[in-house]
Amino acid sequence: MNLASALSLGSEKYGISSRRVLLVDMDPKGNVATTFGVDKRTVGPTMNELFSRGVDSSSLRLEDCTLGPDFLTGSMKASWRKSNPGKSRGPPNHIAVRNLWVLPADMDLSGIEVDLATRVGRENRLKLALSEAMDSFDVIIIDTPASLGLLTVNALCAAEWVLIPIQAEFYALEGMGQLISAI
């Protein structure tokens, strides 16, 4: 999430221009949306709907499921107000999202692996779902669960590059080795 935010903002100081970034949450915990103060119970279609019917149905498009910069900014400011009751001033002006869209996930996504198990081409569902977004974004970052299930396999099949953030501990290193072997 930090990487997505940094890329979307760029840096005038270092001559790095901002990028249009899509941050895809493939983790059923849905922490990406939570990070931006989004109440997952109030958003429309999520990754689960896109997986379960979106690829097979022309009625649901990727843009129907994404949360844009204005929505994310509003959610962050509302979250700030909720966390700071009674403050006379409003949220800081620097709470603003630019050039960043989020494709949220929720707990319903955890059941999709069972559904995917019987489908032909199950490993390419995310790649197909994201194909329409390729020209709209400079960078697409996919946040995966810490497992080697079909959600992670879909992310790996859709990705051109893989970045593996880990904690400096034995079990994380062991898991990274398993992931590298799977790739």
Language model segments and positions:
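P-loop NTP-binding core
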Residues: M1-I183
